[in-house]
Amino acid sequence: MSEVNLSGMTALSIGRGVTLNNASELEAALRHIGATRYHNHHPFHKLLHSGKLNKGQVQAWALNRYYYQSTIPLKDAMVMTRFRDRATRLEWRHRIEDHDGDVGTEGGIERWIKLTEGLGLDTAYVESTEGILPATRFAVEAYVHFCRDRSPLEAIASSLTELFAPSIHEERISGMLEHYSFVNNDTMSYFKRRLTQAPRDANFALHYVREHATTPEQRAAVCNALIFKTNVLWVQLDALYHAYVEGHIPPGAFVPKEG
């Protein structure tokens, strides 16, 4: 795969003067972004996966992450409205089913509730989202707005964090089962299911952007969409670290009962 110099990459973009001349250079740039900016590198995740958080801190993470998980189907429905092409809509529709489930079938949101219930959180409180951090709400809503307002190509590109998700799910499953007595295989079922779902989603999105980003400007937009998405994920962990590791919980947010 082509080598791409992204030394000028900023907090918001791949930087001026970076020209991606073909699909191979685009994919190389996307994988570089994931390798350097995906939230598996965040200090909060390192604490979570190594057993360094207490139960209350894990509860705070699961509670806040629920807002992101439960909003994904809304985001994906928004993406579907951007396409006149039936084949693309059919492919994208299964993402909504993966999270919402169907009549008589369990989806990702229900699996996430298994996690929060297993951690001792009241389901009505979790679903109300009244205890989440303001930064969580702002970040997730910004993601939905991005998929609504930017080009369809950028909307699909923003989902490419799924390329890097299986590794963090594997790390999370093994690390949390090893270190925390209050989680088990059933409560971790969301992550186990995503080990097979995420690669399918990522492969479609990667093929789509390789095929449809045909100019250097479009390839840059694809990369910048992925950078935006990594920022959405990263800032949520910044907020969790500030509130529940450093102890600066904002007014009205969830306050753990267990340390």
Curated annotation (Swiss-Prot):
Is Transport one of the keywords UniProt gives this record?
Answer: no
Q: Look up the record and name the pathway of this protein.
A: Cofactor biosynthesis; pyrroloquinoline quinone biosynthesis
Keyword terms, alphabetized: Oxidoreductase, PQQ biosynthesis
Q: Which GO terms describe its biological process?
A: pyrroloquinoline quinone biosynthetic process; sulfur compound metabolic process
EC number(s) per UniProt?
1.3.3.11
Domain of life of the organism in this record? Answer: Bacteria
The Gene Ontology terms for molecular function here are: pyrroloquinoline-quinone synthase activity
Q: Reaction catalysed by this chain?
A: 6-(2-amino-2-carboxyethyl)-7,8-dioxo-1,2,3,4,7,8-hexahydroquinoline-2,4-dicarboxylate + 3 O2 = pyrroloquinoline quinone + 2 H2O2 + 2 H2O + H(+)
Q: Explain the purpose of this protein.
A: Ring cyclization and eight-electron oxidation of 3a-(2-amino-2-carboxyethyl)-4,5-dioxo-4,5,6,7,8,9-hexahydroquinoline-7,9-dicarboxylic-acid to PQQ.
Question: What protein family is recorded?
Answer: Belongs to the PqqC family.
The name this protein carries in UniProt is Pyrroloquinoline-quinone synthase
Q: Which organism is it from?
A: Bradyrhizobium sp. (strain ORS 278)
